[in-house]
């Protein structure tokens, strides 16, 4: 039984799904997808549970969410192993994901009060109040790269605000979704408040097509995000939050410490085997001997990165990609770039057929035109050389995406210029592109999102504002508008 609907584990009526470890091929999880009827059943359960859940005090909802945080802490080792084995990432990185899930609870509680919550301003004849109300039934679509942390960033603030939820994990990480759902079950959520439906495209289409859905919160690829936006077009009554990918630029200016700059670049481009939406995809490097030295050092250090299994000791920096198919897609993208005129500096290699262990790739594209503006979701970095900083910014902005952007430079003036001219939701200075503060919004513009950033701002799209003018008594105003006569004299 792999679906959680209305407080019960049930067997899916859709196609059989088998999840294997992407490196070893070991079967980790299997079960049947939810069919359209079961998706509808989950929605009805969430709708029935909504009034009572929304009427609970914030404190009552907070207690259950904090109980979930405690369960994450006490089950950290087990959940870490599940995420690592299912995604292929090393144990150390999966552990940081579970820690981020735990920390998200306190952050979301604080954000609710700061970003939403209630406010009251006294007026001479009463008061002006601002309250926030939950939307109702929300669908949450989870991605595979952070199958615990990223959907958690939607689910927790949505529950705190009083919404009920239908959660569909990525079809590539059903085991992680199952494990997290079982912890929510132990936290004592009332039946129907949070429902789990497993499945791929058909399940997702059935979920997003539900008429009785009040909104959809999505993290994933731009292609899927565009499809969801099209599917929900003409329905302004539904909240839609899209956090999508990026073709992210990193600009390397003058650097005093080449190794520090190389470390930052590797952390930006290759962490999580390049499977973060904020990863650097395009590197813009200043022409000259210093740039040459940096590039040679980057290739040399990147060449030493050997992906390994989730439990290898010592731990590798990167593990496998989510699937062998995903790894092969990166290799194919590199081959296509080379065919277009790119100069390979470091060729990506599949270490073994039948696995997703892929070494990083670096290819120089200076002077090559007609390149597709697409995100390659893996450890492949394209390099361009530039002559002046204005040119670097123009090249960085030459994309339909707008998620993250970064600058390595000792000059504050150049960072200030980038802040004014960059088209990105995250702009970092001498910090990896993959770094973000939990107390800041997370999201992008253009093809990277629809201006509804998550993280600190998630509370904003999980509730709608209700403004009120209030007075505990009703009296006739001392001064009336022109043309109003409330005298006792009878007009004939």
From Swiss-Prot:
It comes from the Bacteria. One of its GO terms (biological process) is arginine catabolic process to succinate. It catalyses: N-succinyl-L-glutamate 5-semialdehyde + NAD(+) + H2O = N-succinyl-L-glutamate + NADH + 2 H(+). Its EC number is 1.2.1.71. It is an enzyme of class 1 (oxidoreductase). Keywords: Arginine metabolism, NAD, Oxidoreductase. CDD domains: ALDH_SGSD_AstD (cd07095). One of its GO terms (molecular function) is aldehyde dehydrogenase [NAD(P)+] activity. SUPFAM superfamilies: ALDH-like (SSF53720). NAD(+) binds at residues 220-225. The active site is at residues 243, 277. InterPro entries: Ald_DH/histidinol_DH, Ald_DH_C, Ald_DH_CS_CYS, Ald_DH_CS_GLU, Ald_DH_N, Aldehyde_DH_dom, SuccinylGlu_semiald_DH_AstD. It holds the Pfam family Aldedh. Pathway: Amino-acid degradation; L-arginine degradation via AST pathway; L-glutamate and succinate from L-arginine: step 4/5. Catalyzes the NAD-dependent reduction of succinylglutamate semialdehyde into succinylglutamate. Belongs to the aldehyde dehydrogenase family. AstD subfamily. This is N-succinylglutamate 5-semialdehyde dehydrogenase. It comes from Escherichia coli O81 (strain ED1a).
